[in-house]
Structure formats: structure tokens, C-alpha cells
Amino acid sequence: MALGRPSYRGGRVSGGRDPDFAELSSSLEQDREIFHCDVWNSVVHAVSLWEAGRIDRSTAAGIVEGLVTVLEEGPDRLPEDAEDVHEAIESRLHEVVGEEAGWLQLGRSRNDQVATSVRMRLRERALDLSRELVGLGRALLDLAREHAEVPIAGYTHLKRAQPCTIGFWMSTYAAAVARSARGLLRVPGMDECPLGCSAFPGSTVPVDRHREAALLGFRKPARHCGEATALRGPILEFLGRLATAASELTRLAGDLIQLCSDELGVVEPPDELSSTSSVMPHKKNPDALELVRAELTVVAGLKGLGDAVHGKLPMFYNRDLQVLNGLLWDSVNRFELCVRVLRKVVEGLDVDEEAARGTVLGSHAAAVDLAELVAERAGLTFREAHKVVGRVSARLDREGVPMSPERADRVVEELEREGVKLRVEEVREVLSLKRTLRRPVEGSTDPGRLEVTLDRLRAELAAAERLEGTWRGRIERALRATEAAVNRLGVEGFAEVYRGYWDGEAPG
């Protein structure tokens, strides 16, 4: 499709673009992500120009009505050889309404335009991500509550360390998920509107930036025009929080892969989220978890690429920042899909409680409790008791004797060799699974304490859900306010069409 007027070329730069440069510079495909936000952005700017007395009512109405048409048509009707979505929308608008479209960019640069549209879309995607994380968090809490008292070995350095429960293990990840669900909605600067900053020093047109911010659902205008257009602090902060969440969920995927190994066999993912071998008919492989682990690793790595692109750029705006937008949407898309898959895996997990108990039985995982008993009863410092129990553990391990209640008498014999005398009954008690799970501190694996923790985490997820609702309510009120503003121009239907994009039911 030929590029409709007006193109940004034909003034200081004449002629067409070199085809290789055109391919390099085009961001149209990634800009589909912000298409509807950019139209809303433009509608509000047209209203602002009218309210500032810079264009008349008829011109403003024609522009806004044309923008509603562009929104209804969808991104597939945009010129394919435009440099970006901003040029494409303006060009298509010119085809729809004629020369009046040329007034739209008065007092606005692509710099504040793209910064605003990206924040608007990122806000929408953050709300969706938070909702998905809340769903995953609740699935983890349901799993944790169901198996709150089922013992399993906790590992450090991939060696059996101390007993905990399946509930404690899964709730550890639920706690991280709850933090991320809130954190993605609390990125500094996300609720500040760059519109009106122009290229970087501020617009020469006296638009009401507070009014623009309110109509677009922001809490306030960005406080510094240069920072809002030249830097990408909120995007990098968001990528950082996404990377942290991704790295934590990578570990969840890895743990589940390990727990479903033949050697442990504690969990098994559902068939619909597993694969088989092309040659070995007996295999059931956790492919979904392996792919999630890899994809989330990419998400974590994209933050570093974003820093590399952004870092060392001179003030103020540089075209390099276009690449950063692509990294952002790539991260968001990968992350959202992985969270959905993880939730389905967690909801469909089959847990073998006996296999979980088997990871603790026959081990020396209660050695810490024994060392504390030795320190208390024998009058040794903990460091001295630590060494005593360490030597006992080494000898028993060489002989293949577990540090278990059933072999408490053997443990007592070895302690006596170290000059420590304890009763078999008290050693048997401290080595029992029930006893080793009792931890009298807040947030511990103790089943009673864990129940309190699970309730608290469920409340945190509910708080994240309320925060999401608050944000969605603000956007909806802004959409209604924008609709009221364009109604004053005699134009109707903008909000209804926009909601279709927000609900994922838009054309294109």
C-alpha cells in the first residue's frame, strides 16, 4: 500500500528511503501493540488543541471523527511503508479527513507521543500480568494447603539439608509471586503522563498537561519533560521487576522438573502438559516446564539487553530507544504465556506423598535439631555441638546408618564416643519427622505457623487484585471522560471501540 500523505519526508530530507534503511527503521509490526493507545493519545491531543484555542471546533471534530474511523478499521488498514505507527496513523487520517489531519501534530512530537503510548499500553499489560500472577499464586497456595503437613527434604547445594513440607516449599514461590503481582503495578513513573513534553524541552502550545494526563488515565503529568522523553526509567524498572519474577519462576519450573524425575518421583505433571520421546515409548517428559524454564531465562536476560541499549546514550532522544520497545513487548509476551502454562501445570500436578516422605527417611536431615539438643543438654556451645554431630554423621554415613528414630540407639552410642551422654528416648524424639517440622517462629515450616502464612499470602494476593481493580477503574473513568470530551465535539462511539481493543476483541 502506498504511503498516504503526509510523510515526514519532503522537507529537510527529500526523496524516498533506501529500502534497506526502510526495513531497518520500520517498527510497524511491534507498534501494533500500541496502536489503540496511540489513537486515544491522539484523540486527547486533538481535544487539548481545541480547548487551548489552537484549532477550531470543526477541525477538532473532523480529526477526532477520523481517528475513531481509523480505530474502527484497525491496524491492518494502515499504510505498510510508514516508518512507525505514529506516521501510519497520521497518514491514514489524512486519507480519511484530508488536510485537516495536518493540525494533529501541532505542539506534539513523536517523542512525547511514543513515550505516552508505551506507558499506556504497558499499564494495560501490567494489569493483565498481575492478574495472571494472582491466579498462579492462588494455585500454589491451594497446592500448599492440600499438602501442608506432608514432609519432604529441603535441599541446599542439591544435598538434603533439613526437612520441610510440600506446603512450605510451594508457599515459598507463592510469596514471591504475591510480591511480583503487586510490584508490577507499582513501578515509579508508570502513572505519570509524558504528553505535552514535545521533543524534550516542552511544548510551545499551552496545552493543559494535567487535563491530558487525567483524560488518559494517568495520576499526573510527568514532572520533567527531558526525563519523560529522553530516558526510559519506568520501562527499565518494569523490565527489572519482570526479570526478577522470571528468575524466581524459572526456579519453580526447575524444581518441578527435578521433583518429577524418576529418582524422586514426588510430582507428575498432567499428560496435556507433557510430551513423549520420538523413539523411547516409555518416556513422559516435562517439556512444558523445560520450555518455561528456557523462555523465562530469556525474559531475565532481556533486562540486560535493555540496559545495554539504553546506557551511554547522549541526551536527549535517540532512535536507539525504538529497539528498547521491542525488547519490552517480547519480555511481556513471553512472561505472560509462561505464567499461564505454569498455573496449568500446578493445578494439574499429581503429588505422591509417600515419595515425598521418602526423601527424608534414611537421611541425616535432622542433624541440626540433634546439634541443638546436644548444645542444650551437654552444656556445649553450638559450634562445639556442631562439630560433634558432624563427626557422628560422618561415621554413620560411612556405615550406611540413617540418623532416624529407628536407629536412635546407634546415634546415642556414637555421641557417647564424643563424650556426650543423652537418653535414647530424647534422641528418638528429636529425630522424629513430626518433631523436626515443629519450628516455633513466624513464617516457618511448622504446619501451624504455615497455616497462618498461607492466610497472609492469600490476603496479599487479594490486595494485589484490589490494586489491579483500582487501576482498571481509573482507566475506565478516564475513557468515559474522554468520551464526554469528544461528545462535546459532536463525535460519539470512541470509548466503545476502544474497549474492544482492551478486551481483545478489536479488528486486526
Curated annotation (Swiss-Prot):
Q: To which pathway does this protein belong?
A: Amino-acid biosynthesis; L-arginine biosynthesis; L-arginine from L-ornithine and carbamoyl phosphate: step 3/3
Task: Supply the EC number(s).
Answer: 4.3.2.1
Keyword list, A-Z = Amino-acid biosynthesis, Arginine biosynthesis, Cytoplasm, Lyase
Query: What superkingdom heads the lineage?
Result: Archaea
What Gene Ontology molecular-function terms does this entry list? Answer: argininosuccinate lyase activity
The subcellular location is: Cytoplasm
Under InterPro entries, the record lists:
Arg_succ_lyase_C (IPR029419), Argininosuccinate_lyase (IPR009049), Fumarase/histidase_N (IPR024083), Fumarate_lyase_fam (IPR000362), Fumarate_lyase_N (IPR022761), L-Aspartase-like (IPR008948)
The terms describing its cellular component in GO are: cytosol
Q: Which GO terms describe its biological process?
A: arginine biosynthetic process via ornithine; L-arginine biosynthetic process
Q: Which reaction does it catalyse?
A: 2-(N(omega)-L-arginino)succinate = fumarate + L-arginine
Q: Where is the signal peptide?
A: none
Which family, according to UniProt?
Answer: Belongs to the lyase 1 family. Argininosuccinate lyase subfamily.
What's the protein called, per UniProt? Argininosuccinate lyase
Q: Which organism is it from?
A: Methanopyrus kandleri (strain AV19 / DSM 6324 / JCM 9639 / NBRC 100938)
For this protein's source organism, the top of the classification is: Archaea, Methanobacteriati, Methanobacteriota, Methanomada group, Methanopyri
